[in-house]
């Protein structure tokens, strides 16, 4: 049954910016869907607001729209493009919500919804419908009630009994959910949940805390053929911890064959009843003693778990789901890995896969590290091993958190009962301390089987000595359990190179096994490998010219999908140019770990030992470290010292930039100004520097990504507090103390250099003033307020510096501009590698910078690539950052030098105001709210807000302000004075709760985050009220509101903007 001939044009809805609960897995699924449908001759139209995705590259679909993912905007695209069908199931929760919204607006007349019907989405997402649907099937679900008020929640709990799990309907990653053990907790969680559900509904569920959790990925086609992909997955953590927060293993380890059969049958029964055509994820809870099970949830779309199942088996769920959505059947779709089996063969595996989440707690001081029913992790890693112990050890060192294996971590009994992100390490430490498996099981509800595996690792470590490792059998056993050389070195007091030498002397080297979807039953044609210490090696090494690309590992704040984007582009460019490309990475969510992006894929930890072993096996011409963010840059020097050729910019140049004193010498030689600074190894040093250059100063450790431990301090007291904290971050590296340039405009430049010529890819003006981390600030191309002569100076400095550093490939330089001072341009920092703005600049200008950079590294010249004149654009593109505050109770939404954003959205239009408005809408901030504007600013800003107040007044807003702010501008407009929270009721908090306020402008005073400002900002986050914490942001917001009121919002595809 070939594809449905009535479907010739499909609109694919993407998932928008990377956020907690919805990360790179949807770029992977959306990209696969685009490719898959085009293979079938279907015209594809894609809409997504995230510029850092591969799917928004112009060549991925016939037309790509980078527009806000709201039903109103997507309806305009449907009107313009007239697709035959809409595919929402590749866009995560966002895709489903947009599709539901479109249906409610009546915008889907004559357009089919494929993959999952609107009825199916509602049956699964609306809890009452879901429960009654499951009851019709005789499938058990936890007792639950859907409620629309706190009163109803209190009534429901009388029936169900405490503890209850509270979950808002139609949200993502458990946003707003929690476990309530008492009336007070229920009132607090239900209030928050009702605000966050876009249908104002929360579910009060009977608690199945402590039950085991299993997941099944099921595929179904229109012939009703169903298969289970990846047998099943088991969460090591029991119910009560969101599956996205759990350590997950596949195949399941503690499920009996009989129970597996029951859950399999139930999964197939459910997908058939729901009539889903494509992929679906089903989660079950199983009682550890009785084997009783409950259906917890069904996702009628591809998900985080389906990305994991795809990478764990090599079976491309999204690609196959897209073909099924247009009417093809499993038996007609070829398995790309074997090229001879159909997609209806269930994949099987003969290894163990472990997934561990990566959390952002290092970025947010003072917030709870507890994990539970609401997701907090930003990304994840996956590792493959022959045993669970090996797989676990490899996954831990893939996390890139400075741990080369299980490490001793302080714990209390309460920590074991109320898990945090440190859970695995605390369990390991308790076992090492002699606590019994039974006792730990009682506290954690983790199955004794898994505790025994961790105990095996702890026991083996206790037996290792310097002498015992000289026995090759013991060394081989250690390697087979997944111990890294560096871990063995720290356990025995030896150094890593001695362990390596000992290993090589005894010919103990890893071999590589293939991930082939069929446990070696058929021959695989797509080389996708993992390393282990087994006997037979399955890699066929070719004699082609090869390049190895080091990926960027798990998504975390400071190192997001942008770097994966650059790695994929490098692989594509070098493959096009005839090189064999080899990708090394360990992130199951991303496009770079797709089996058909590079010629060979190694799913391995990104450590020196693991990467060197692959290099020794493959013997590439060189290694690319420029694209994988700090993770791959950190490997440049050790790899070069091991004799590996680093392609592109010499690694020596990286040190010339990252070592501050050497960088200053470079700048002095070139005559490029930088802010006064000093280097300090103690508080006394730092105070002396601050006295010499004057407060405020920006303090930070050297060698750091995402501005970690970076702060602006205003006096000695704050400086001393910082030094106590930060010196611990990096003891061997001193602290930098820079003069903070207040009120400067920050500018980012991405450029290409081939060693002789420089091409300026894009100059971005930041909208937030200097002092907000460049990864968090909104920015705009082309610059809107910077005079031409200053732009020329910036270009000149960029050229000089790129040539001096002998850059081959990409360089990113950040400047601070003070137009009225002399000098007017200061350099802040330079990074001779891909930056997080590369995808945005590429989308804004239409020039694929990362691809070009890869070609330059292989010897091409800018002239040959046609890059002589930089590209002027007629439109305006704005990048806005997206923050995780809503997912992290207690986090302050103030922006500063430490990066806090997880992702980005882009707005593009003919004028700045509308482009900025689109960028805000894409970041879930609708500026066109009704309501008053509330303004409260710190003392040093009070004389700078006249124009803001005037503009708000001209736009017809009623303005509220606190007394001090109102006094400063009372002659400009009528201001309603409102009390601070600390001044008694009625106050600003009451006004916000009553829905009077539609926009909040609040600049933070000092560092007391417990102040009124913090409370207001936190309420804005939780209630979804647009807020800005900088004056520049406020000006941009008001200009955007004006532009939208005056003009019409139109949609255009990228190829229309780029005149193609």
From Swiss-Prot:
Binding-site residues for Mg(2+) 4, renumbered to this chain: 829, 831
The keyword Ligase appears for this protein: yes
Region (Oligomerization domain): 401-539
Binding site for Mg(2+) 2: 297, 299
Entry's EC annotation: 6.3.4.16, 6.3.5.5
Stretch list, region Carboxyphosphate synthetic domain: 1-400
Gene Ontology CC annotation, any one: cytoplasm
Similarity-based family: Belongs to the CarB family.
Function recorded in the entry: Large subunit of the glutamine-dependent carbamoyl phosphate synthetase (CPSase). CPSase catalyzes the formation of carbamoyl phosphate from the ammonia moiety of glutamine, carbonate, and phosphate donated by ATP, constituting the first step of 2 biosynthetic pathways, one leading to arginine and/or urea and the other to pyrimidine nucleotides.
Protein name: Carbamoyl phosphate synthase large chain
Source organism: Methanothermobacter thermautotrophicus (strain ATCC 29096 / DSM 1053 / JCM 10044 / NBRC 100330 / Delta H)
The gene coding this protein: carB
């Amino acid at each position: 049954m070939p594809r449905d001939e009535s479907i010739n044009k499909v609109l694919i809805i993407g998932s928008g910016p990377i956020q907690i609960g919805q990360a790179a897995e949807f770029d992977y699924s959306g990209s696969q869907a685009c490719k898959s449908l085009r293979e079938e001759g279907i015209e594809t139209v894609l809409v997504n607001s995230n510029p850092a995705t591969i799917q928004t590259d112009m060549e991925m679909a016939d037309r790509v729209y980078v527009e806000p993912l709201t039903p109103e905007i997507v309806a305009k695209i449907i009107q313009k493009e007239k697709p035959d069908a809409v595919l929402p199931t590749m866009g995560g929760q966002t895709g489903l919500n947009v599709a539901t919204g479109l249906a409610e607006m009546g915008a889907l007349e004559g357009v089919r919804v494929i993959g999952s019907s609107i009825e199916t989405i509602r049956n699964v997402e609306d809890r009452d419908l879901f429960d009654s649907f499951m009851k019709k099937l005789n499938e058990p679900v936890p007792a639950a009630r859907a409620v629309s008020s706190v009163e109803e929640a209190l009534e429901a709990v009388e029936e169900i009994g405490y503890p209850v799990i509270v979950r808002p309907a139609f949200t993502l990653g458990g946003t707003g959910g929690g476990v309530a053990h008492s009336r007070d907790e229920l009132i607090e969680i239900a209030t928050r949940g009702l605000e966050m559900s876009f249908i104002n509904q929360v579910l009060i569920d009977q608690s199945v805390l402590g039950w085991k959790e299993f997941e099944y990925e099921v595929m179904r086609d229109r012939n009703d053929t169903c298969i289970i992909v990846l047998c099943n997955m088991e969460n090591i953590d029991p119910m009560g911890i969101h599956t996205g927060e759990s350590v997950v293993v596949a195949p399941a380890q503690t499920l009996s064959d009989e129970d597996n059969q029951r859950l399999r049958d139930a999964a197939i029964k459910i997908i058939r009843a729901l009539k889903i055509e494509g992929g679906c994820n089903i989660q079950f809870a199983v009682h550890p003693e009785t084997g009783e099970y409950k259906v917890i949830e069904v996702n009628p779309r591809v998900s985080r778990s389906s990305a994991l199942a795809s990478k764990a088996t090599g079976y491309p769920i999204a690609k196959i789901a897209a073909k099924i959505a247009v009417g093809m059947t499993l038996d007609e779709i070829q398995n790309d890995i074997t090229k001879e089996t159909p997609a209806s063969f269930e994949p099987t595996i003969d290894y163990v896969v472990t997934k561990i989440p990566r959390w952002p707690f290092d970025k947010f001081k003072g917030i709870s590290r507890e994990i539970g029913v609401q997701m907090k992790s930003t990304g994840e890693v996956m590792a493959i091993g022959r045993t669970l112990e090996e797989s676990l050890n490899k996954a831990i060192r893939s996390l890139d958190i400075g741990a080369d294996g299980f490490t001793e971590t302080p714990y209390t009994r309460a920590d074991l009962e109320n898990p945090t992100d440190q859970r695995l390490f605390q369990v390991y430490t308790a076992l090492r301390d002699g606590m019994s498996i039974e006792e730990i099981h009682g506290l954690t509800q983790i199955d004794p089987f898994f505790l025994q595996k961790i105990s095996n690792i702890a026991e083996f470590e206790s037996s290792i000595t310097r002498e015992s490792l000289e026995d090759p059998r013991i060394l081989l056993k250690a390697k087979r359990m997944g111990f890294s050389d560096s871990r063995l070195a720290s356990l025995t007091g030896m150094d890593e190179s001695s362990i390596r030498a000992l290993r090589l002397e005894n010919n103990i080297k890893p071999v590589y096994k293939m991930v082939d979807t069929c446990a070696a039953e058929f021959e695989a044609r797509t080389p996708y490998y993992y390393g282990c210490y087994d006997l037979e090696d399955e890699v066929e090494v070719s004699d082609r010219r090869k390049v190895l690309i080091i990926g960027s590992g798990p998504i975390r704040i400071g190192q997001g999908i942008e770097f994966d984007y650059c790695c994929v582009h490098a692989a594509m460019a070098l493959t096009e140019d005839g090189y064999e490309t080899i990708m090394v990475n360990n992130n199951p969510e991303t496009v770079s770990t797709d089996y058909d992006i590079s010629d060979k894929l190694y799913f391995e930890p990104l450590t020196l030992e693991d990467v060197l072993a692959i290099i020794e096996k493959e013997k590439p011409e060189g290694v690319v470290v420029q694209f994988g963010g700090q993770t791959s840059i950190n490997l440049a020097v050790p790899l070069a010292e091991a004799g590996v050729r680093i392609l592109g910019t010499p690694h020596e140049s990286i040190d010339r930039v990252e070592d501050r004193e050497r960088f200053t010498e470079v700048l002095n030689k070139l005559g490029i100004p930088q802010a006064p600074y000093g280097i300090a190894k103690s508080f006394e040093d730092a105070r002396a520097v601050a006295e010499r250059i004057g407060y405020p100063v920006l303090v930070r450790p050297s060698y750091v990504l995402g501005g970690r431990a970076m702060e602006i301090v205003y006096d000695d007291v704050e400086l001393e507090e910082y030094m106590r904290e930060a010196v611990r971050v990096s003891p061997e590296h001193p602290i930098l103390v820079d003069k903070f340039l207040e009120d400067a405009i920050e500018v980012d430049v991405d450029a290409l250099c081939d060693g002789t010529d420089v091409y300026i890819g894009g100059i971005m003006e930041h909208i937030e003033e200097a002092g907000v981390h460049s990864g968090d600030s909104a920015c705009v191309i082309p610059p809107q307020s910077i005079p031409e002569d200053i732009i020329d100076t910036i270009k000149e400095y960029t050229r000089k510096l790129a040539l001096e550093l002998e850059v081959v490939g990409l360089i990113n330089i950040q400047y601070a501009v003070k137009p009225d001072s002399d000098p007017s341009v200061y350099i802040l920092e330079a990074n001779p590698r891909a930056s997080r703005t590369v995808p945005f600049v590429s989308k804004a200008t239409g020039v694929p910078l990362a691809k070009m950079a890869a070609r330059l590294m292989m010897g091409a010249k800018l002239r040959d690539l046609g890059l002589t004149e930089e590209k002027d654009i007629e439109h305006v593109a704005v990048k806005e950052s997206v923050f995780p505050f809503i997912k992290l109770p207690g986090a302050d939404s103030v922006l500063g030098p430490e990066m806090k954003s997880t992702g980005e959205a882009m707005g593009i239009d003919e004028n700045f105001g509308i482009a900025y408005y689109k960028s805000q809408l894409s970041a879930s901030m609708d500026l066109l709210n009704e309501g008053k504007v509330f303004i409260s600013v710190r003392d040093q800003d009070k004389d700078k807000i006249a124009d803001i107040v005037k503009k708000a007044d001209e736009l017809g807003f009623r303005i509220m302000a606190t007394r001090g702010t109102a006094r400063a501008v009372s002659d400009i407009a009528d201001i309603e004075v409102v009390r601070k929270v600390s001044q008694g009721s009625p106050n600003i908090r009451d006004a916000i709760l009553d829905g009077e306020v539609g926009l909040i402008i609040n600049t933070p005073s000092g560092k007391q985050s417990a102040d009124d400002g913090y409370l207001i900002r936190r309420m804005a986050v939780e209630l979804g009220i647009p807020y800005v914490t900088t004056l520049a942001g406020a000006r941009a917001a008001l200009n955007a509101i004006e532009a939208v009121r005056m003009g019409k919002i139109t949609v255009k595809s990228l190829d229309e903007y780029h005149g193609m």
